[in-house]
Swiss-Prot record:
GO function terms (MF aspect): magnesium ion binding; monooxygenase activity; ribulose-bisphosphate carboxylase activity
InterPro entries for this protein: RuBisCO (IPR033966), RuBisCo_large_chain_AS (IPR020878), RuBisCO_lsu_C (IPR000685), RuBisCO_lsu_C_sf (IPR036376), RuBisCO_lsu_fd_N (IPR017443), RuBisCO_lsu_N_sf (IPR036422), RuBisCO_lsuI (IPR020888)
Organism of this sequence: Drosera petiolaris
Protein name: Ribulose bisphosphate carboxylase large chain
Site (Transition state stabilizer): K325
PTM entry text: The disulfide bond which can form in the large chain dimeric partners within the hexadecamer appears to be associated with oxidative stress and protein turnover.
Amino acid sequence: SVGFKAGVKDYKLTYYTPDYQTLDTDILAAFRVTPQPGVPPEEAGAAVAAESSTGTWTTVWTDGLTSLDRYKGRCYHIEPVAGEENQYIVYVAYPLDLFEEGSVTNMFTSIVGNVFGFKALRALRLEDLRIPPAYIKTFQGPPHGIQVERDKLNKYGRPLLGCTIKPKLGLSAKNYGRAVYECLRGGLDFTKDDENVNSQPFMRWRDRFLFCAEAIFKAQAETGEIKGHYLNATAGTCEEMIKRAVFARELGVPIVMHDYLTGGFTANTSLAHYCRDNGLLLHIHRAMHAVIDRQKNHGMHFRVLAKALRMSGGDHIHAGTVVGKLEGERDITLGFVDLLRDDYLEKDRSRGIYFNQFWVSMPGVLPVASGGIHVWHMPALTEIFGDDSVLQFGGGTLGHPWGNAPGAVANRVALEACVQARNEGYDLARDGNDIIRETCQ
């Protein structure tokens, strides 16, 4: 006789456990599941739990050599999505033992690495994760965080101002440095390499770093303020990336930059550790995020990528602008902005927050509002994002008809006016345009 009956097994027999009581140490996931026609939601949810943890399509002999009850993922709750046909929110609990300590790479490889191509599912989206404090404590997190950054820069009580240098490609290193100097001298706190500025034939990284450092120190001497330029250290290998970060540190600049999705979480975590050890701030760009998060029923919501970045490490991350979007999108965006900044966040489905999240004092990340914004958006941005943010105007600075420095002056004056008006009790949503007009006189 044989020990078990071979053949295809229903996942729900093992992995659908609606009576399961989640543990404080479990990683919890909320998936938006669209099953194939004829596949019950319980089977689809159990399949997700199985294929992202211990399961395969049949019973295997080696199942008897371990404790599946200890290590398996469990689909513990399913709810239909209101207003959507054949879509369900499936909740899965994963035992903490399944994950390597301090590795976002391993966490994602387990939870989303294989299951998204599963035949029983028409579409699958990871909406949110609850990361338990026991796992968070295995990560360094951001190199410095919001308060330490403010102390390093000696800038308090207002959002920070930035500018992406344009045109993003084609400038020589010296002309690039000139634009950096003009913007910083005009009143900005930071300027920025674009995400695809690495080390191309028209401007090699070392030349850019040297001219930008010169611009930073000249602007600091003239304004009496601490300035920075996000020097993009992203490279083709981790070794080259660290080499660029080392050179930035040797120049004495305050901040470097990384494209964390195209560069990868392993590289990003290595760079974040280097930055903390060597006193560098780390700006994070989310290039490639829309490939993952744009579809509403498949992929991964950006709030998951934002949580992962806080664990992997970064002091700033691009987070959208909200301005001009629908109210619902505003609430969703502010939901993950607060996930980046706050120490504890309550579950709030209206803001897209599926679980309570406690960060056990891990430093926060400054959200960066960037993309298509200009001086007339300043009142709304100041009101929506508050002081702990970076407002980044590329064309909104360099597009000023009088030049780069006047563009920077306009942004700084508008920001100072909006902050002062807010502190004096004005309603920025109602009076914002009048405040900007009066400031322009």
